[in-house]
Curated annotation (Swiss-Prot):
Record localization: Cell membrane
Ranges facing Cytoplasmic side: 1-41, 111-133, 202-208
Name of the protein in question: CASP-like protein 1D1
Superkingdom to which the source organism belongs: Eukaryota
Alphabetical keyword list: Cell membrane, Membrane, Transmembrane, Transmembrane helix
Family to which the UniProt record says this protein belongs: Belongs to the Casparian strip membrane proteins (CASP) family.
Cystine crosslinks: none
Keyword Cell membrane listed: yes
Transmembrane annotation, as ranges: 42-62, 90-110, 134-154, 181-201
Extracellular side of membrane: 63-89, 155-180
Complex formation: Homodimer and heterodimers.
Organism: Vitis vinifera
Main location class: membrane
Length: 208
């Protein structure tokens, strides 16, 4: 009589499921929208005008030199005296400040041309430009106001403290100073427009 095999057959091996594939990487964020073409063109035009006005203002102030023969108390003869911008610290500050504004306008004009050729200008870059424009506006406005105050005293005098007006003697010098201050005021207005333009562009991007 044969023996019965009581051993149970081994169960078939369990099929292991393959691990699921890793999820696909998220798509890259879309590039920032380029500034409108009108913005870039207007920005370049304003910065070129700013450069021209800053340079013109400095040149007119530096060339404001006039020599006159004036009467000095206690001296029997007329004395030659030269009026120039170096005689006033306010005018020296004016020339230095507008020179900085002119140098800044050169740099930012070149940057604006680059933004036109590569319109993917980031919002951070426009924000930095707006901040620097505000700083240059403060510099130009303070220099214009300081020089304007001194020029007004030279034109009208101040009877309360005994300051005599000098523009009746140094007429050419005063015309140069007045023209330079007027051009600097125009440069300040251009900087205001540049700040508004940058802020409007930032607002348009944030709204989107």
């Amino acid at each position: 009589m044969s023996s019965v095999d009581t051993e149970k057959p081994a169960p078939p091996p369990l099929e292991t499921e393959a691990p699921p594939p890793p999820p696909p990487p998220p798509p890259p964020p879309p590039p920032p929208p380029p500034p409108p073409a009108g913005y870039s063109a207007l920005d370049v035009v304003l910065r070129i005008l700013l450069l021209g006005s800053a340079v013109a203002s400095v040149v007119v102030m530096v060339t404001s030199v006039q020599t006159k023969l004036i009467a000095v108390a206690g001296v029997p003869v007329l004395v030659s005296n030269k009026a120039k911008f170096q005689n006033s610290p306010a005018f020296i500050y004016f020339v230095a400040a507008l020179s900085v504004v002119g140098l800044y306008s050169i740099i930012t004009t070149l940057a604006s041309f680059i933004f036109i050729s590569k319109p993917s200008c980031s919002t951070k870059t426009i924000l930095h430009l707006a901040i620097w424009d505000v700083l240059m506006l403060g510099l130009a406005a303070s220099a214009t106001g300081t020089a304007g105050g001194v020029a007004y005293v030279g034109l009208k005098g101040n009877s309360h403290v005994g300051w005599n007006k000098v523009c009746n003697t140094y007429d050419k010098f005063c015309r140069h100073v007045g023209g330079s201050i007027a051009v600097a005021l125009f440069a300040s207005i251009l900087l205001v427009l540049l700040v508004w333009l940058s802020l409007f562009t930032l607002y348009s991007r944030i709204r989107k």
